[in-house]
Swiss-Prot record:
Name the UniProt record assigns to this protein: Dihydroorotate dehydrogenase (quinone)
Annotated binding of substrate, by residue: K65, N110, R111, M112, G113, F114, N171, N176, N245, T246
Molecular function as annotated in GO: dihydroorotate dehydrogenase (quinone) activity
Source taxon at top rank: Bacteria
Cofactor: FMN
Pathway it works in: Pyrimidine metabolism; UMP biosynthesis via de novo pathway; orotate from (S)-dihydroorotate (quinone route): step 1/1
Length: 340
């Protein structure tokens, strides 16, 4: 059924198709239809960050930026749902067109630019949701906030979403907000992590619960840079790392229609680079910090490869666009079939 739906959706512009799909998934969730229309994955519970996941396959941030279809995505069989990236204030993002399909490579290029309705709008939708599973909220900075003041935006979002999130992801790796990726390095990273850790401990005391913090990183760092990030995450007391965001590289899409568009590349071409980052992180972290792997999962076996590389959980986005809900089940089955 999804194959037919995709054929129809792919006749529309990518962003129109995205918005329509979100509306349909959201409506199906409100009516309780999605679980009836989609075969559910087998139960494969796992505990990570002190949280209990129904299965290790989640929705990556970016697909549902405003929390418009939380119930709908959960009913499709995801073991957890991550929404956002959300910023303190609403912002329109970059000019259109800003989303490009490259079906020949099972890939997508986007330069959306954190378009979202703001953190208060997102929280209203979260509180209206009936979903009781693991919900991640991905936070970022506003486009017009100077990078040297980025910490302020992250702290605003952290405080606002704290009581409504199962875990919180700090996005310092989108390539579509100028200067953002500089926060992954050196003193900038240390200062941000220390500020987040300090505020989180204050919130844990005042709210009576400690919400895990994850950092989402890029796949374009050298092994040495990745190792430095791993050390900083452990030193600051972060709870997880998400590897990875989109890549600025164009391997696998050179010469293809839209392959030269600016923005972050996701989908099949980023698989190898992203999984390599997982392996490097696993070697550096030594099991002290869980890894959530995202990037390039377009077949069930790719999810198993991420787990074998050292990840505890996986997330999908572009693969879901191309393969539909069946990919969730395939990924869960592939992980379940791994030797114990």
């Amino acid at each position: 059924m999804y194959t037919l739906a995709r054929q129809l959706l792919f006749k529309l512009s990518p962003e129109t198709s995205h918005d329509l799909s979100l509306d349909l998934i959201g409506a199906g969730g409100r009516l309780g239809l999605n679980g009836l229309l989609c075969k559910q994955p087998a139960a494969l519970p796992v505990s990570v960050m002190g949280l209990n996941f129904a299965n290790p396959v989640g929705l990556a941030a970016g697909l549902d930026k405003n929390g418009a279809a939380i119930d709908g995505f959960a009913q499709l069989g995801f073991g957890f749902v991550e929404i956002g990236t959300v910023t303190p204030r609403p912002q329109p993002g970059n000019p259109k067109p800003r989303l490009f399909r490259i079906p020949e490579a099972t890939a997508i290029i986007n330069r959306m630019g954190f378009n979202n309705l703001g953190v208060d709008n997102l929280l209203a939708r979260v509180r209206a949701s009936k979903y009781s599973g693991v919900l991640g909220i991905n936070i970022g900075k506003n486009f017009d906030t100077p990078v040297e003041r980025a910490q302020d935006d992250y702290l605003i979002c952290l405080e606002k979403v704290y009581n409504d999130a199962s875990y919180i992801t700090v996005n310092v790796s989108s390539p579509n907000t100028p200067g953002l990726r500089s926060l992954q390095f050196g003193d900038s990273l240390k200062q941000l992590l220390d500020a987040l850790a300090e505020r989180r401990e204050q919130l844990a005391v005042s709210n009576g619960k400690r919400v895990p913090l994850a950092i989402k990183i890029a796949p374009d760092m050298s092994d040495e840079e990745t190792a430095l990030v791993a050390a900083a995450l452990m030193e600051s007391g972060m709870d997880a790392v998400i590897a990875t965001n989109t890549t600025l590289g164009r391997e696998g899409v050179e010469g293809l229609p839209f392959g030269g568009e600016a923005g972050g590349l996701s989908g099949a071409p980023v698989l190898e680079k992203s999984t390599h980052t997982v392996k490097v992180l696993a070697g550096e972290l030594g099991g002290k910090l869980p890894i959530i792997a995202a990037g390039g999962i377009t077949e069930g076996r790719h999810a198993a490869e991420k787990i074998a590389a050292g990840a505890s959980l996986v997330q999908i986005y572009s693969g879901f666009i191309y393969k539909g809900p069946a990919l969730i089940r395939e990924a869960v089955d592939a992980i379940a079939a791994m030797p114990r």
